[in-house]
Amino acid sequence: MPLTTYTAGQVLTAASLNANFAAAGGLQFIKAQTIGTTVSSVTVTGAFSADYDNYLITVTGGVASTSNNLYLTLGATATGYSYAGIYVQYSSATVNGTATNVATYFDAGYGTTNTLSGRIELESPFLAKRTIFRSNATSSTTTTFMNNYQGFLNDATSYTAFTLTASSGTWTGGTIRVYGYKNS
């Protein structure tokens, strides 16, 4: 939609201003959720809707009680997750691979005593079809890893919520942010 050009003395209507300043595309912020104190999981509700097909979830700040992984599940589904990917330990030049087609979660990030890290993309979690998953994360200690994983959830369920669960220990602080990729 072209922008309206105004001249001196012209009356500006709310409709015209809203049309000029509406978001044009890209990422649209949906919600942020603060991670509590010494929690082993966090459920984010109202994350997915018919407004967007694809989503970005970030996990930043906070700390873990011990080095752990961030496991992501959609709704109450605890089966049917398949993913594969690579990971590298910072103290080694060896690239490692992993794959599973019977997982109960997606491996979505890392937690250390310094920070929590996760960047997760989901395609079609609200649509009643398979959800595609991509994640990459890094940790802030030399004895831990960076990863890049991709996979899917083998079902045709519409989801509005997700849960992040610590593989061990707990988390304190940090923020989970959810963004929608604008459909255009």
Region roles according to the model:
Residues L3-T4, A8-Q10, A14-L17, A22-S184:
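Surface-exposed molecular-recognition determinants
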